[in-house]
Amino acid sequence: MKKVLYIAASALLFTSCESFLDTESYTKKTTGNYPVTEKDAIQMVTGVYATLNKSIANCQNTYFYLSELAADDRFGGGGENDKDMQVMDHLLYTNINRFQSFWTDRYSGINRANMAIANLDKVANETMRNQMMGETLTLRAFFYNELVEMFGSVPLITTVPQNVAEAQVYPAQSSIDEIYASIAADLKKAIEIMPAKNWKETVSGSGHLTKWTAEALLGRVFLFYTGFYGKESLPLMGEDGTISGSIGKEEVAAALKDCIDNSGHGLVSDYRSLWPYTNTVSKKDYPYVKNAPDWVKDGENPEQVFAIKCSHLASWSTTIGYSNQYMLHFAIRSHGGADQYKKLFPFGQGWGAGPVSPKLWKEWQAAEPNDPRREASILDGSKTEGYIYGADKQMEETGLWQKKIIATTAAKEYDSNGGIKTLFNSFTTSKDYYGDGEKEDFQLSHEIDLNVIRFADVLLMHSEITKTADGMNRVRARAGLPAVTYSETALRNERRWELAFEGTRWADIRRWGIAEQALSNQLGSDIWNRGVATVMKNQGAGYAARYAATKGFMPIPQTEIDLSNGVLKQNAGWDASAVFVSWNE
C-alpha cells in the first residue's frame, strides 16, 4: 500500500465519501515515511477526530440523538412533518436507511484509526507516540461502543486492507463478545500507555483524549455490557485476536478511582455554570443566573472528561459538523418571531426536537423537591408570558424544554427603557464574546462543545460499581443536597437528575432492565399536537411491544445489507409492521 489515502479503498465497503476531510499533505506522504514528526502524528490522528464532527452534520441520525429521543424523559417532537423525530421516541421507522450516514461516519473513523494504529510506531518520540496511540485506540473503542449499543452485532475491523480486492470483501458480523473484547483491549492498552498527566497538561493539545477519558469510557462500557447482557466481567481480546481474558469490576473500579484521584478533573462549584446560558453576555439579562458564576468555557471546564469539539469554522459548503447541530435541533420551534424569543430569553430558535416529558418534572419534584438542578436543567415555557402552544405545528409538545444543549441568545440592542430590543441568534456572535468577525446564522452559530462524559458521571459510575455512596454524595453536595445511604434506587435517581439530557438515560434504562416499564410510563402524559391538547398514546405496536421486539437495537441500513450480498443480517423487529405513517390521534 503506497499512500495513506489508500484507506479510501477500505471505505468502498461502507460507501464512504471522505474527500473534504483529507488534506493535500496526506496524499503526498507514504506509509514508508509517514508519520515521523510529532506534527505528522497529530495530523494523522486529527483525521480520526474529524469523523466525530462529520456525524454531527447529520445529528438526527446519530446515537446521541437516539439516546435522547428514544429514552423516557423526552418525546420526539418537531413539526407535523418531522416524522423522523417522532419515530425515534416510538421505536418505529420511516426510512430503513435512516442511519446510513452514521454507519458510514463511524466506519470511516474506524478505518482512519486502523491506519493510524498501523503506522504510529514510526513516531520517534515515545511520549508523543504513546499519547497518539492511546488517543486513537480510545477513539476506535468509542466508535465501536456506539455501534454495538445502537445496532448490536456489527463487523469488527481492526486491520488495514492490503489491497483493493481484500477491501471489497464485506466482513461478516462479529459476535457481541468479540466486539466488546476488542473495545476492552483497546481501552486497556490506552490506559497502560498514555501519560498520566493532569488534564490541563495534555501532551497533544486541547480537546484531545487522555488516559482519564479511556478510564471513564471503560467504566461506561463495563456497566452496559455486564448489565444488558447479565455478565460479571468484560471479555478481553488477546494479541492473537481471540478472547483470552476478562476485565472484572475491581479493575474497572480501580480505573475510575485513578481518574477521580489523579486526573485533576473535578466538579465546578455551581451546576448552572456548566451550561452556556450563564455566559457573560447573556447572563446580565437573565435574572435566574445573575448570582451564578460565569459559564466555564469549553477547554477550561474541569468536568469535561470527553467532549467533541465544535468551533466557528462551520460552513454550509464544507464542515457543518463543526457547529453543534444538537443545539439547533433541541431548541424551541419557530415561536412567533423575534418578539416571542425575547420572552423566552435566552433560549433561541430551532427545530423543536425532544420536548421534555412532564413525568420527569413531576417525579423529580416528588423525589427531590429541593433539588436546584431541576430548574437549572428544564425551562417551563408555560410559565413564560405569551408562550405559544403549537407554534409552527409543533408535535408532542409539553411546554417543557431542556436548557443544557439549546440555542442560546444574547441581547444585540436595548430600547430606551433598558429592555432587550433585538437579539443575537447565538451569544457567540456577539462582539462582546468572540469579536466582530463572527458570522450570524441561527442554524450554524452554535460553537459549543458536546459533552460526552462529565466528571460527575465518573463519580456516579464509581459509586454504582462499588456500591458505595461517596461519589454519589459528592455530586449531591454540589447541588446542596444532603448525603444519602447507597441504594440502587438512590443511584438510579441521581443519574437521572444529574445527567438529564446528556445522552446517558437510554443506555441506563436498557442495562438496568427497566426500559419497557420506563417507556410505557410516558403514556397518558399531557401533550399538545399542533396546539391541540391530547395525551401521549402508543404508536404502532406501542412502547412496550416495540422494545420487546427490538431490545432497543436500530435497523442496520438496508443499503449495507444489499452491498454485503446478504452477509449482514437485519436486526429483529424492523419489518414493514414497524413503519410509521402518521400520528395516531
Model-inferred region functions:
Residues T37-I56, G79-F151, A167-V203, T422-L450, ...:
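Conserved, well-structured interaction surfaces
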